[in-house]
Swiss-Prot record:
Substrate binds at D21, F22, N23, R36, H59, L60, G61, R62, R119, R156. Its EC number is 2.7.2.3. This is Phosphoglycerate kinase. GO terms for biological process: gluconeogenesis; glycolytic process. ATP binds at K211, E329, G356, G357, D358, S359. It catalyses: (2R)-3-phosphoglycerate + ATP = (2R)-3-phospho-glyceroyl phosphate + ADP. Pathway: Carbohydrate degradation; glycolysis; pyruvate from D-glyceraldehyde 3-phosphate: step 2/5. Monomer.
Amino acid sequence: MAKLIVSDLDVKGKKVLMRVDFNVPIKNGVIGNDNRIVAALPTINYIIEHDGKAILFSHLGRIKKEEDKKELSLRPVAERLAELLNKPVTFVPATRGAQLEDAINNMNDGDVLLVENTRFEDLDGKKESGNDPELGKYWASLGDVFVNDAFGTAHRSHASNVGISEAMKAEGKQAAAGYLLEKEIKFLGNAVDSPKHPFVAILGGAKVSDKIGVINHLLGKADKVIVGGGMTYTFYAAKGIKIGNSLVEKDKIELAKEIMEKAGDKLVLPVDNVCAKEFNNDAPSEVVEGDIPDGYMALDIGPKSVELFEDTLKDAKTVVWNGPMGVFEMSNFAKGTLEVGKFLGTLSDATTIVGGGDSTAAVQQLGVADKLTHISTGGGASLEYLEGKTLPGIAAVSDK
C-alpha cells in the first residue's frame, strides 16, 4: 500500500509536527557524526520552503536517571541544525507545558523549532518508549499534521512516532512519511519484495541469534546469502570444522545445521580466516584455511574468502549488506570488511544497499558511499525490515 508522503500535504501556515532521528553521538556537547541530522534536511527544507512551521521531535540515547538529562540534551543538535539550515532554530528545553506551547504559538511560517529529547518523558514511567496514549494525544494536539521521517526508530512503537500518528488520524488529521522514510521504504522494500536477480545478501556480525530472522527470510528471496563475521564460526561448528577459540553460540549450532540444510548451495561461508592467539589488534596473526588450530581465534576473513565473495557478487543486480566481516574496530582485522565495501563500489550495474554501523563506516572510510545506491539510516529497523516484519512507525503513517 502506497503511503502518504510529505509532498502530498498542504503545509502552508500549518504547524507540522515532525519525528526525526537526531540520535547522534555527542560527547561533552560536541557532535561526533551529524549524518542523521543531514539526512533529515530535505524534509525539513520542504516544510519551511512551503511556509509550514516545522516542530521537530527526536530522542537521544536512553534516559535512566535525572543526571542523564545534562549529557543527553538536544541543545547541541539545535545549534548544528541551525548551521546546516543557515537559519535560526528555536530550542525548547521542555517536552510539555506552557514553555513549549507558547514557543509553538509564537512561530511564524517557515520557522523551525526543536523540542527537548522525547525520552526525558521516560523518567516518569517510560511514557515515550512505552507509547503512553495520553502523551501521544498531547503532542498531537500541538500540531495540524504529522510527518514521520525517523526510520531509525520505525521498528519501535513510541509516543513520538506511533502515538502522534494514531492520535492525529483519530482526529481526521494526516500523518505522512518524510523523504528519508520514503527512500528507505522504496529501496529496502524493493530489494526484499521485488529485487532484480541475481540478488545477493551479505550478512556479518557476531551473533547468529541477531541475524537468524534475516537469514531465514532472505534465503527465501535471495540467490545467495554470504555469511561473514563472528557468526561464521557457529556455522563452522555445525559443519564439523574446528574453530579453536573463535566466537561460537553453542546453543545455536543445531539451528545453524537446520539453516544449512534448508539453504543448500545458497549459503556462502568463508574458506579461510585471519587468526590470532588473542583478541588484540597487535596480536601476531596468520591466515588459516579449514580447521582453526587450538588456541587460535578467527578475527577476520582471509584473502581466498574475499575472492570467493567477490566472485559471488560480480554478476549481482541487487546487493544488500548488513554487518562486518571481522572485528572491524581493530584496524588489523578490518581488511575483509573494507575489501567487501570496496568491491561493492565497483558494481555500477547493481542496486547496492548498505545498513548497520560498521558496514556504513567502512564504505564512508573508503570514500565509496556515493557509488552505492542507498545507505540505510536504521540499524535495528533495517534488519527488521529485511526480516519481512511490519514496522509500527511505517504502518502508522496514513495510506494514500
